[in-house]
A protein has these predicted regions:
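Short, low-complexity N-terminal tether/leader segments at secretion or assembly junctions of large
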Residues: 1-30
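GGW-centered surface loops in extracellular recognition modules
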Residues: 23-88, 179
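Short aromatic-cysteine micro-motif
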Residues: 60, 71-72, 91, 96-241
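Acidic glycine-/aspartate-rich tracts in secreted/extracellular proteins
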Residues: 81-83, 138-141, 251-256, 298-299
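Short, solvent-exposed loop/turn elements at domain surfaces
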Residues: 84-93, 141-146, 257, 269-272
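Disulfide-stabilized, aromatic/cysteine-rich ligand-recognition loop
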Residues: 158-172, 177-182, 233, 254-299
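Active-site-proximal beta-strands of protease catalytic cores
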Residues: 243-252
Length: 299
C-alpha cells in the first residue's frame, strides 16, 4: 500500500473533525456538526466536584466556587446549559449555548477560536456536564513559582501568549481534569451568564465597564496594578477582576502569530476598554498589564 506523508480532510463550514487513537492503535476521525449538535445536559444545576476539590461557597446560579485542597486555588462554575442559544463556534451559525458572542461588531469578525482538539473536547465536556469551571482570580505565581488562582496576590504579568498557554496547562493534568488557557468561547460564555443572571447589563458588558473593574477612570481608582480580589465591587457572580486590572490572554487569534487580549486594564478607561473588548497583539509580546486565566476541562 502506498504511504502518504499527509492527507487533507475537507468539509462544509460548521463541520469539525476530532482525531483520536483507538484501543488497537488505529486512528479515529470523527466529523462533528457543531452547527446543529446543541444538546446540553440539564444537570448544570448540580456542578460536578472533581477529586481533590471541595465546595467553597455559592450556588450554581450565582457563582458555585470549588477550592483545590492542595493549595487553595479556586474556580467558579459557569452553567452554560442555562444560557440562550445565541453563541457561535464557527463564526457563522449563532445557535450554540457555548460560544462567542457578537457584543462589539467592530471587533468580532476578525477574531476566532481555532476548532482544534482541545476546544472540541471542552465542547463535549460542557454538553455532558452542562458547564465548565474558570479560575476565580487571574492566575498568580506561588512562592514556589507554581500557578494558582487565589486572592490577595499580584497577578502573573509580563508573560507572553506561549508561556501563558503552557503555564495554564500545568495547573491540572490528570485522569479526571485538565486545564487550559481560556478560549474566546469560554470568555464570552461567562459574559453571557452575567447578562442572563441580570447582574450586569449588555451596556455594562459591551460599552462601559468602568465601575466593576480596576480602570484608570474608576471611582477612587488606584491607577496601578493591584492584588487579586482587592475590592468587592469588582466581583461578579463570585468571579473577581473580570472587567479590569489586567487584560487577559485568550486562545482567540487572527492569523498564525497574533493572539487576542480580552477586557480592560488599569491603564485604560472602562468605556474605552470594556470587558467585551478585544485587542490583537503578537503572541510573543508581553506587558505589566497583561495576565491570564485558566479553565478546567472535566473528562
Amino acid at each position: 500500500m502506498k504511504r502518504y506523508e499527509k492527507f487533507v480532510l475537507e468539509a462544509e463550514k460548521g463541520i469539525a473533525f476530532k482525531v483520536s487513537e483507538g484501543t488497537s492503535g488505529e486512528l479515529i476521525i470523527r466529523a462533528l456538526n457543531i452547527a446543529i449538535a446543541n444538546v446540553y445536559s440539564t444537570n448544570y444545576v448540580n456542578p460536578p466536584i472533581p477529586e481533590g476539590y471541595k465546595h467553597f461557597c455559592g450556588e450554581w446560579n450565582n457563582g458555585f466556587v470549588i477550592e483545590r485542597c492542595s493549595d487553595g486555588s479556586q474556580f467558579v462554575w459557569i452553567p452554560v446549559g442555562s444560557l440562550d442559544s445565541n453563541g457561535t463556534l464557527d463564526g457563522e451559525h449563532f445557535s450554540q449555548k457555548f460560544g462567542k458572542r457578537k457584543y462589539r461588531n467592530c471587533e468580532f469578525d476578525d477574531y476566532y477560536d481555532a476548532l482544534n482538539g482541545e476546544l472540541l473536547e471542552q465542547l463535549e465536556s460542557v454538553k455532558k456536564y452542562g458547564g465548565f469551571y474558570i479560575s476565580r482570580y487571574n492566575i498568580s505565581k506561588s512562592s514556589e513559582g507554581k500557578p494558582q488562582s487565589v486572592r490577595g496576590v499580584m497577578p502573573w504579568v509580563e508573560i507572553h501568549f506561549e508561556d501563558a498557554k503552557e503555564v495554564s496547562s500545568t495547573i491540572e493534568d490528570n485522569e479526571a481534569v485538565k486545564s487550559h488557557l481560556t478560549f474566546g468561547a469560554e470568555y464570552d460564555s461567562v459574559l453571557e451568564w452575567f447578562i442572563k443572571t441580570e447582574v450586569k447589563t449588555l451596556a455594562e458588558i459591551a460599552e462601559d465597564s468602568t465601575e466593576w473593574g480596576n480602570h484608570w477612570n474608576t471611582k477612587n481608582s488606584p491607577r496601578k496594578l493591584v492584588e487579586t480580589g482587592s475590592r468587592g465591587k469588582w466581583c461578579t457572580n463570585n468571579i473577581y477582576d473580570f472587567a479590569g486590572n489586567v487584560c487577559e490572554w485568550t486562545q482567540e487569534q487572527t492569523g498564525s502569530t497574533r493572539r487576542v487580549l480580552r477586557g480592560g486594564f488599569f491603564r485604560a478607561n472602562g468605556d474605552e476598554h470594556p470587558v467585551a473588548s478585544q485587542e490583537c497583539i503578537h503572541h510573543f509580546d508581553c506587558a505589566d498589564c497583561v495576565g491570564f486565566r485558566a479553565t478546567l476541562y472535566i473528562k
